[in-house]
Amino acid sequence: MKKLAIFDLDGTLFDTTRVNFLAYEKVLSPRGFHPEFDFFRRECFGHDYGYFGPLLAPGASPAELRAIHQEKKDCYGEFLDRAVKNEHLFALLHLMRREYHTALVTAGSRANSSQILQQFGESDCFDLTLSAEDVTRAKPDPQGFQMAMAHFGVTPEETIIFEDSPTGIAAAQAAGAGLFVVKGFN
């Protein structure tokens, strides 16, 4: 029976910090919000939008925060040329496909995840993709990882998770699976 390898997207398979920042900057600037890149990288990247949205647009109403997030997702593709692919991890992923089911579990949207995988020619490398739309509880909750394990009928002991962010690492640890921390890529 095949085991399971689960991969995070942002910061693990791709450095998308600049992509996400530029998309948010595009939709925030006309509204009078001007976040700095270092602030975004330090305080926002790797966290759920529900947490960092109010940091980017202080005082914005919940409806305005939802609109900002949707507009960001809509223009995300304009900045994909700023993403950096983790070539070494993709090489490992392709080798692992012989012995492992592969799953992508990301806090990002399905549309944005699909866009970046297509941009870099990696659309077919996952047996399962779970995105923000598929879960009701974001990382650090392990729900997405648990759903992937249930989908393939594997145990945490038969699973390894590749993650980079503190919230993703906490989710992987809560899931009880093996953990490979990707450091220094983004």
Show where each model-derived region lies.
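Asp-based, Mg2+/Mn2+-dependent phosphohydrolase catalytic module
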Residues: 1-3, 91, 100, 110-186
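Active-site neighborhood of HAD-like aspartate-dependent phosphohydrolases
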Residues: 1-42, 174-175, 185
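Hydrophobic residues in well-ordered beta-strands that form the structural core
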Residues: 15, 104-106, 181
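An amphipathic alpha-helix signature
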Residues: 21, 25, 37, 45, ...
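Short, surface-exposed acidic
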Residues: 33-41, 59-68, 124-125
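A metal-dependent, Asp-based hydrolase signature
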Residues: 45-75
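Short, acidic loop-to-helix structural element flanking the phosphoryl-transfer center
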Residues: 77-104, 110, 142
